[in-house]
Amino acid sequence: MSYQRRHSRWYERVLFSPPSLFFLGAMLAVCLPALERWGWGFWEYFDAVRVNTLGGAFVAFLLTGIVLYRFLRYPGASPVAYMIPTVTTLYGSLVGALFFLRLPYSRQVLFESYVVALLCCWVVYFIGRRYRTPKYALLPFGDYQPLMHHTCVEWRLLDKPDLGAVRYDAVVADLRDDDLAGEWERFLARCALAHIPVYHIKQISETLTGRVKIDHLHENQLGSLLPSPIYAFIKRGMDILAAVIAIPLFSPLMLATAVLIKLESPGPVMFLQNRVGKGNRDFRIYKFRSMCQNSEQHGAQFAQDGDMRVTRVGKVIRKLRIDELPQFFNVLKGDMSLIGPRPEQRTFVDQFDREIPFYMYRHIVRPGISGWAQVVHGYAADADDTRIKIEHDFYYIKNFSLWLDVLIVFKTIRTILTGFGAR
């Protein structure tokens, strides 16, 4: 029996393919404002204002589509949560660039294009939520039960090696299970021949949870975790630029924070502590002191909810992440990056290295002021939490890219506004 992949018919590919939606949205975001401002004959004459405005609007919308589409690759990145920030950031950057370069443009047309872009994104989102919820066929072998708790996917558990007349986006199976043999293997081959993707259960689990299991990492998987050296070089340049801009920008806030800390409690304003960074090398991290003096005189320990060592000023600056602003100096020195796994104390590193397999591998990249584990999982309060946090860190290393870093920046802003994960 031949199978068909979901949305594989020609009209479905046209209606639901990202390129088609990008092109249609871009035409609406460019042409509708132009028609309203200059009428039907706007294309008959192109002066500098029209070229700059319409060309800029097209590029801004195109980048919006690319960014939101890339975000969809990562768990918990619903487009509706980042739609307004993404569109606003890109159109705002366009206006800033045109203003800085002193190029003529129409503010009215750009504003209307911005509104149309938002509406287009909303329409595409609702169409996608209605018609593009993934539908996966799941084979009843291995550890498949946890996957079925993820409601963002429509699961169909197969009881025989046959899809019937139902069309699916993909087939998911534990390809290493010993019971997967005979008719089931031939069934997977037929699915592949019908251009229906066949995914290993671990691959789908990582995509849905944002975690890479670390209990049984094989040598070939470690190879896939190697971060891109090209992006690492580019990322370092962006880190330096961001630190050079952020340090003078936040200097008044850092000065005010230092004064408040000094007025509230005795002791130094800064909290200096050795942490473990890239290559398992120690460095000294800079933070504003948020706890009472000598808070770790009995040794390193995790901060807890309602920790009595935290001062009143400390509670505020921890919630808003102001205590971490001095770490921009660590970024400038090369000890840290803006985005990466959070650095731990040597005491904890040695302990976790004994308890958690492959723990040291997280030191293959620079630690960050913010990171995937912080914005998804929050603060790690014990060894079990740390194990989950490490799985998030491995996911970040495996998916080391500009798009994931941009998503983490957006999530970090949300984290600061909500106080998620603060102790």
Curated annotation (Swiss-Prot):
A Gene Ontology term for the protein's cellular component: membrane
Localization per record: Membrane
Membrane topology type: Multi-pass membrane protein
Cytoplasmic side: 35-47, 101-107, 261-423
Purpose: Transfers N-acetyl-galactosamine (GalNAc) to undecaprenyl phosphate, a step in the assembly of the repeating-unit of the O-antigen. Shows no activity with UDP-N-acetyl-alpha-D-glucosamine.
NCBIfam families membership: EPS_sugtrans
Record-given protein name: UDP-N-acetylgalactosamine-undecaprenyl-phosphate N-acetylgalactosaminephosphotransferase
Biological source species: Aeromonas hydrophila
Name of the gene: wecA
